[in-house]
């Protein structure tokens, strides 16, 4: 895969992730603002969801998909050289990443596409940890406990547990542990990206293969 193809793949995934996270963040605040991207498939939540339900779905999306954004950026940075700004895969029109305006553009892109989703995840996580998991029995919620507990034994595929306020089906203990692990992976990859960008800045610019000198013969 060429660097150009990798950049196209990365920017597509990064923008889609940013849009979803911003929209979910707004939904937890009961905001009417939403970013819309026309796609062959439509991504939306049906029905009136509670603030807690949006937070749960947002953490699920973030944990499952966001780590790919810094992962691809790290892969791009490891194959780059010349400057740290060029190692970051964002490109805007014909602005040279090593130029002064280019460095500003790359810095802003890093904050928006990498840091902003991480901050949104913190916001969603604060909502999730404040909720309770309850057993759903005969139109009633019983045996409520925090998200790290399993009040009663339940099979992995049933509908035993729901979040408070008749939220989505939720597997306590398992889901928050997986979310913490995958979020930690995303944070690690983000830190690794910063390191690889600095390393790229210390590597000499790749100049490619120089053409061979023509072979001349003399006739005596």
From Swiss-Prot:
Main location: membrane
UniProt keywords, alphabetically: Cell membrane, Membrane, Plasmid, Transmembrane, Transmembrane helix
Keyword Membrane: yes
Residues annotated as transmembrane: 9-29, 54-74, 105-125, 177-197
A single cellular component GO annotation: plasma membrane
Membrane topology: Multi-pass membrane protein
Compartments, record wording: Cell membrane
Origin superkingdom: Bacteria
Record has Oxidoreductase as a keyword: no
Protein name (Swiss-Prot/TrEMBL): Uncharacterized protein y4fD
